[in-house]
């Protein structure tokens, strides 16, 4: 599973249209469609009912919150890394990763 596929899935959930979701993601519609086919193959079933309109299947509804969380956690990790990149090199010492440290990076659970 690739982050790109997750982002496309989430855009398609919001747009409910392959062309608009592809435009939003800055890719061609066939590229988005192929990514969704690959994700469906990996997850073992259809994520969307494609006719007459785009709606989530039972599997799509089941995986949506997990994929949303993955995308959010990736955003938190990216923000934490960017913040650390702005810290002076002398302050970038290795530290043990403890539960409190994980929570400060935006991880819940």
Stretch-by-stretch model annotation:
Residues 1-31, 35, 63-68:
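N-terminal short secondary-structure element
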Residues 34, 55, 100:
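Short alpha-helical
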Residues 40-56:
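A short LG(V/I)-centered, amphipathic sequence patch enriched
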Residues 42-43, 63-87:
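Alpha-helical linker/hinge and terminal dimerization helices associated
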Residues 82-109:
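Interdomain hinge and pocket-entrance segments immediately C-terminal to HTH DNA-binding domains
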């Amino acid at each position: 599973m690739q982050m790109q596929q997750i982002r496309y899935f989430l855009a398609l959930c919001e747009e409910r249209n392959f062309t608009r979701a592809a435009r939003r993601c800055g890719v061609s519609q066939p590229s988005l469609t192929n990514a969704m086919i690959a994700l469906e193959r990996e997850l073992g079933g259809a994520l969307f009912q494609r006719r007459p309109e785009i709606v989530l299947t039972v599997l799509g509804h089941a995986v949506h919150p997990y994929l949303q969380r993955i995308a959010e956690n990736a955003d938190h990790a990216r923000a934490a890394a960017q913040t650390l990149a702005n810290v002076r090199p002398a302050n970038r010492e290795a530290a043990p990763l403890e539960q409190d440290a994980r929570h400060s990076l935006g991880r819940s659970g």
